[in-house]
Design a protein with these regions (language model features):
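Contiguous surface segments at macromolecular interaction interfaces
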Residues: 10-57, 125-194
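Structured alpha/beta reader/binder surfaces that contact nucleic acids or chromatin modification marks
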Residues: 43-158
């Protein structure tokens, strides 16, 4: 059975099944996620607050038809428990990744975009040498942990970012404080069904 994420104005965000592998990834708020030229990053944690940069700045930078995405986490992304990956696998394919960020205007956590049919890595990996994540003005190598085809992905414009992600503490279901969330459990079925 296919379901949709709907915006408040009735636009379709992403068709999913309740049985699809879903990962919500919390990042800092940006307009384009294609570097900092003409854009900036707001929120997203203490590192961003201190340095005005985060590894997610290139999450929607088209690198020969591929997006290389980054979300920070403690330990590793648990692909074995949450996506039934084999124990010797370092990645899992066909995960729908929903990128979310806290709107700086105070209106809450919003969907900013998604990758469908993504590859999710258990640990951070180094980017290919011919990408902005590898060669950039910041003299840093920006690791990534999620990749997807550009054709299977969507970055929402600021005006399209109107779907609120429920807050587990306030709403009794939804995303908590962690940057990675798997939308598991009976209480969270509400979110998959909306």
């Amino acid at each position: 059975m296919r379901k949709n994420y709907l915006s408040s104005n009735g636009g379709i965000y992403m068709k999913i099944s309740m049985h699809d592998n879903i990962l919500f990834a919390k990042v800092g708020w940006m307009k384009r996620y294609d570097g900092l030229d003409g854009d900036n990053i707001k929120g997203g944690g203490s590192y961003i607050d201190k340095h005005n940069i985060g590894w997610e700045i290139y999450n929607f930078s088209d690198e020969n038809g591929i997006y290389y995405g980054y979300v920070t986490y403690q330990g590793c992304i648990d692909i074995h428990k949450n996506f039934n990956a084999k124990l010797n696998n370092n990645f899992v394919d066909n995960v729908n990744v929903v990128w979310v960020a806290k709107n700086p205007d105070g209106s809450g956590m919003k969907i900013v975009g998604w990758y469908k049919n993504a590859r999710v890595y258990k640990h951070y990996v180094n980017p290919p040498k011919n990408t902005k994540r590898y060669k950039n003005n910041y003299k840093k190598i920006f690791e990534y942990n999620i990749e997807a085809n550009v054709s299977d992905s969507k970055l929402l414009s600021i005006d399209e970012r109107n779907f609120n992600i429920p807050n587990a503490k306030n709403d009794g279901y939804g995303m908590g404080r962690a940057n990675v969330w798997y939308c598991n459990g009976d209480k969270n079925k509400k979110l998959k069904e909306n």
